[in-house]
Structures are given as structure tokens and as C-alpha cells.
Amino acid sequence: MRIELSNAFERLGNVLIYGTQKVYALDAGPEGPNHPNDKYFVVRKVANEQSWNVEQEMVIVVPIKNEKLKLLEGVITGIPHNCLIIVVSNSDRDDVDRFNMEKNVVENICHFSKRDFLIVHQKDPEIAELFESMGYADILGEDGLIRDGKSEGMLIGILLTQLLQKKYIGFIDSDNYFPGSIYE
């Protein structure tokens, strides 16, 4: 991969949030050195092995609510193989259990592609208890469960990433119509 070097970030407490980096090539060709004296050194080559090492320490969180199952399938298949997938669903569980349908799709894909994953429902009482025990009750609604919203689902993903002791995290919308863009 050839990727632009990061040059700016914002600090939010102990977290550094870097700006968007431009990807110039997904395949950078055979292994070769990066030369600091090269006038193009603002673009860094990342070897496949380096990408794989980062992916093994990375979680990709996919928040979803009642999306088409084919879109979810495309998103899951587009995520790099070594990344742990966490799907945080806030889909309906009433007449038609959309969450169970999503779970079946993810289980099927991950079984045949030999991948690890975790899928949780945003309204799971145990997740609400976990947030409350950490002193973060503002995320809870009047019913004592996690409120509706994509940002709440993302916070669940962040918490699970920390509990799993992963180093990196990424977020992908479940309604992504271009699975090939996920790898970027």
C-alpha cells in the first residue's frame, strides 16, 4: 500500500485523532525501502506484512439498524481478513427478528471464511449494566437500556475493543454499497 503520511491530529484527552490519510495505491509492489531523501517521501510504502500486523491488532465496528442483509454481507466480506469484526445491531427484534437474521448472515460468512467476530444487540441489558458500572449512565435511556443512535452503537464498539485489548479501531457503515472501498 502507498499511503500519505499523517501530518495533523486532534487530542481528546489521552486519545489522538489523526486526520484522513490519502491512499495512493492498495498494492505498492514488491518490498523495497522508503527513502527519507526521496522527494516523494510524503507518501509511505506499507508492506503487506506491516498491514497484516496492524490488522491483527484492529477491530472493525459495524453499527447496523434494519439494513438490507445483502449490504451487510458485502460489508463483512470487504473487511480485511485479520481484523476482528464487531457488529453492533440496534435492529428490530419484535415480529421479525432482524437481529437474528443479521447474526445468521455474519455467522455464515465468518464460518466459511474462517474469521473471528462478535455481534451484540445495542439493547442488551448486560451492556447497559456494563456502562452503568463504569459510571457512564448518561448513555442509558429511561428504560435503563442503551439509547437509540449510531453514536451509542459506536461507543459500545469502543468499549468492546478496549475489553478485548485491541490497539486499533475502525468504523464502517452497514449500508456501504461499495464493499471494495472498505479496504481503503
Where do the PLM segments sit?
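N-proximal low-complexity "stem/linker" segments adjacent to membrane-targeting elements
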Residues: M1-H81
